[in-house]
Regions:
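Acidic, small-polar-rich N-terminal luminal/periplasmic segments of exported/outer-membrane proteins
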Residues: 23-158
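Hydrophobic, lipid-facing positions within transmembrane beta-strands of outer-membrane proteins
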Residues: 26, 83, 146, 159, ...
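Outer-membrane beta-barrel translocator/receptor signature
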Residues: 83, 100-102, 114, 123-132, ...
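Periplasmic-side early beta-strands and strand-to-turn transitions of outer-membrane beta-barrels
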Residues: 149, 157-158, 166, 178-277, ...
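Transmembrane beta-strands of outer-membrane beta-barrel pores
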Residues: 165-169, 195-199, 240-244, 330, ...
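Solvent-exposed loop segments that connect transmembrane elements
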Residues: 202-211, 248-308, 353-361, 402-434, ...
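Structural signature of Gram-negative outer-membrane beta-barrels, strongest in the C-terminal barrel
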Residues: 225-229, 377-378, 389-393, 437-586
Length: 586
């Protein structure tokens, strides 16, 4: 890979302190406990990085933090492209967009409740703090593994500006710039932008002259810092991300078990690689260990409707957000209000099967809005610091999965291999999953740090959270009607396009499929599923630390937290798959 070539063009007076990796870590100021402290003064396991350190390491997205943070891993699901964050082995494996993470993500003090919202470019960063272990007292739910705080550079009193341009492999062009300065006696502003584009993809098709993986993304942020009075200020933060990049394709590697999908028409020649003349050899579209070798489906035309779908793995995602942070210094007490709103819209296609054939692909459409409000009072002196606060959040998600499957998977292969008759007679080609999820959460919290001697300090924290999450949805018959054909053949229903096809398979339900078949009313076993999870949890933290000297802090912590429960928002066949998932406590 070519080394990234960077040139820094200075516009005006540039006053940006550079912190090298060799400098001692105590020079980094963090806000892990909602107030500024030296990283060596905090009784929390923290990896803190300055913006310059991150820039030197090619920091581009939030997921890149895993490359230089011990214990942090980030994997992207092939099914939906949702990032999965794990710290010290505490994570989750759920490709549903609606699933809650075990790692909290905060951007300039505002929580991002779903990891799919974190995939935009990172730029003009002041620092990033990775907190390890449950952070339930100050940050609340969904921080059982830890917390990551992303902090942007703030507007400056003096004018400064900068522009960085870079060229890299695959024709990648990376441009980042900012301008900052005074807007009068009582206001300061900052505008920053970054765009990354590449001229070619890094994945190469194993069956045709095609490539995948081009980047085309842009992000900007405008910040306005206004002094409302001598002791009151407001920081406005408007941000926008547009991502038109291509997703990666799965790689089918040498040794992959060839499934039934390849055995039947129209892929009958593949049988030669199982029991024919080429038995035991690797099909030509399977990689032999090359990381950039892959295959994918570019389009699919429905035989039933004649409609052609663009299935090339790619994104059309936008995030728009606005936050306002108000601080009122009342002398010994500081009142802080943080209000945040984010709107995330997504149309994204992914290929699951790793081959050129269309055995498993999907298009995700997401409409997600989030709102949060935090109010907190804080104060203290050299010996005692305290925080009291309340928090409220509300988010709503509408998700639409359109799944595509081939006749080789559910049709002809079934006939060739004597699978269940309905699949051979009525293959399923497309299906839709649609759902709505609404989540409301409220919390009260307190935090006290008491230095009872020159070296010893005791920290106590507690938070009570009440959450309600409602999920309503179903797997519906798509426009091609093939799912209805299967259900009507298998169960004697009278389904049509747009009808719910999720089976009530709960034996305790009065409308379960077996009871309805006996009663001669099978249609009654199919209806939209809806349920609500209500969670009330008390979380706490106790830390005792001992300061050996300015460079060494010994501490011990006992803390707990919880990850919100949820629902299987992805494709489901029966209502038992949609039963609520209980909260996870750690």
């Amino acid at each position: 890979m070519l080394r990234l070539i960077s040139a820094l063009l200075m516009l005006g007076t540039l006053l940006m302190p550079v912190v090298s990796f060799s400098q001692v870590i105590e020079e980094i100021i963090v806000t892990a406990q909602k107030r500024e402290q030296g990283v060596n003064d905090v009784g929390i396991t923290v990896n803190a990085f300055t913006g310059e350190q991150l820039k030197d390491r090619g920091f581009k997205t939030a997921e890149d933090m895993a490359m230089f943070t011990p214990g942090l891993t980030v994997n992207e699901t092939a099914a939906t492209g949702v990032p999965l964050y794990t710290i010290r082995g505490v994570g989750y494996q759920d490709y549903s967009t609606a699933a809650s993470s075990t790692v909290g993500l905060y951007f300039d003090g505002v929580a991002i409740p779903y990891t799919v919202m974190s995939r935009g470019l990172m730029f003009d960063v002041e620092r990033v703090e990775v907190l390890k272990g449950p952070q339930g007292d100050l940050y609340g739910r969904n921080t059982t593994a830890g917390q990551i705080n992303f902090v942007s550079r703030k507007p400056t009193d003096e004018y400064e500006a900068g522009l960085t341009a870079g060229l890299g492999s695959y024709g990648t062009f990376d441009l980042e710039g900012y301008t900052s300065g005074s807007l009068g006696d009582s206001a300061r502003g900052r505008l920053a932008i970054r765009t990354v584009q590449s001229g070619e993809g890094w994945q190469k098709s194993t069956t045709r002259d095609d490539e995948l993986g081009e980047q085309d993304t842009m992000a900007l942020r405008a910040m306005l810092d206004i002094d409302l009075s001598d002791n009151t200020s407001v920081m406005l933060n408007l941000h926008y991300v547009d991502d038109q990049s291509e997703n990666r394709a799965n790689t089918a590697y040498n040794g992959t078990v060839i499934g039934l999908a390849e055995f039947g028409t129209p892929y009958s020649p593949l049988g030669d690689y199982v029991f024919g003349a080429n038995a035991g050899e690797t099909p030509p579209w399977y990689s032999t260990g090359e990381n950039d070798a892959a295959d994918w489906t570019n389009s699919y035309t429905s035989a039933q409707t004649g409609r052609t779908f663009d299935l090339r793995p790619q994104r059309d995602n936008q995030l728009f957000g606005l936050s306002a942070t108000i601080t009122w210094d009342m002398g010994n007490t500081l009142l802080t209000s943080i209000t945040g709103f984010d709107q995330f819209d997504r149309v994204e296609s992914n290929d699951w099967d790793g081959g050129f054939y269309n055995d498993s692909s999907n298009i995700n459409t997401t409409d997600l809005s989030t709102f949060s409000q935090e109010l907190r009072l804080s104060g203290g002196d050299d010996d005692l610091n305290w925080i009291l606060g309340v928090y409220f959040s509300s988010d709503e998600m509408d998700e639409y999965y359109h799944y595509f499957m081939s006749d080789s998977l559910y049709g002809f292969a079934s006939a060739d291999w004597a699978l269940a008759t309905p699949f051979a007679v009525a293959p399923i080609m497309e299906l839709d999953t649609k759902y709505n999820q609404e989540t409301d959460s409220a919390a009260v919290f307190g935090h006290v740090e008491w230095r009872f001697s020159d070296a010893w300090r005791l920290t106590l924290g507690a938070r009570y959270t009440s959450e309600e999450r409602t999920w309503t949805g179903c797997t519906f018959v798509a426009d091609d009607g093939t799912l209805a054909g299967f259900m009507n053949f298998a169960f004697g229903t009278s389904m049509g396009v747009g009808d719910c096809a999720t089976i009530d398979d709960d034996p305790d339900s009065p409308t379960n499929i077996l009871s309805m078949l006996i009663a001669g009313t099978p249609d009654a076993a199919f209806s939209v599923f809806s349920d609500t999870i209500e969670t009330d949890r008390l979380m706490g933290k106790v830390t005792l630390d001992y300061s050996v000297n300015d460079d060494v802090l010994i501490y011990g912590t006992v803390s707990n937290g919880f990850k919100s429960g949820g629902f299987n928002g992805a494709n489901s066949n029966g209502t038992r798959q949609l039963q609520p998932i209980r909260e996870e406590i750690l």
